Amino acid sequence: HDPTLNVAGVVINRVNSARHRALLQDVLDRLGVPLLGCMPRTDALQLPSRHLGLAPAHELDDPAQRRHAWADLAEQHLDLSSLVPLMQAPTAGPSVFAHIPPSRGPSLPVAVAADAAFHFRYPETGELLEHLGMPPVPWSPLSNEAIPQEAKGLILPGGFPEQHADQISQATESLISLRQFCQQRPVYAECGGMLLLGRQLSDLDGHAHPMANILPFAARRGRLQVGYRLLKPRKDGLLVRKGEQFNGHEFHRWELVDHRGADDGSVLWEIDGWRVSQRPEGWNKRTLHASWVHLHWASCSTICFRWRAALATEARSLPSGL
């Protein structure tokens, strides 16, 4: 216990009986920690999970009904008169983007993959893109549609493409559009988004499905990789420069069977972390950044400035209408 922490109270879950509660109450009283309530063990509080943790919110059945059930349990088992005042949000401080001047240049829309297969996104990234004149435009690879024509760049976030690998492989218009886009415009892909760029992706049952065939790898189920990572670029790239260091997060259960040659020269960076052997990782090409690692763009505005500069450069170099 850290004595500098001000513990205002605790809520305990999975309490099975009045005796169980009394035992917990006795322990907390001796510690001087207020007990704000005990939630029972009940199916109403259970959430479905899969190989990376909880199932995403959009897959839950009737979320409104769940919230009502949780509210009823809270009224029955929690000291809301004490708990609610403790949960009041503090006074809002300055905007996290207050130190970042907004863009005064032309609007440069950015397509962002957004559907049941691709939805691991930091909200602040979208807010920062808006702030810097790069409004996000949703694109659904699952819907078998072309990337929006107005997009000057493409972001492929993480998600669960392995769960939808068969449907993605049949979305031929999406895959053709992606291949064409990668030849003309900047593309940023991380984790599940990167898997869309490979030759093949194995689904949850181990069946392989063709992907966009932009990068020379096949992806299949592997061991869990999770944790914060220290990243050192091997050379200058779309968003990074040699000699810099970045921090990111890795979280996946798929692995790549890499087919690029030893002298390919496209490795993005050296990746290191706690109990992780340093290794080369990712792809670094003139208009492509692809990696397992999630970056929080709002924590390093340089990334977003470089992204905008790349969009503007490529937009000027292409014929009008492309």
Predicted regions: what they are:
Residues 13-17, 113-117, 293-296:
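Structural motif
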Residues 104-106, 118-136, 223-322:
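C-terminal and late-domain segments of enzyme folds
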Residues 1, 25-29, 125-131, 170, ...:
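Short, solvent-exposed amphipathic alpha-helical segments in soluble enzyme
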Residues 154, 190, 212-215, 251, ...:
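Hydrophobic, well-ordered secondary-structure elements that form the walls
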Residues 106-171, 176-180:
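Phosphate-binding active sites in nucleotide-utilizing proteins
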Residues 160-237:
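Cysteine-nucleophile active-site neighborhood
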Residues 1-102:
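Internal gly/pro-rich beta-alpha loop/helix module
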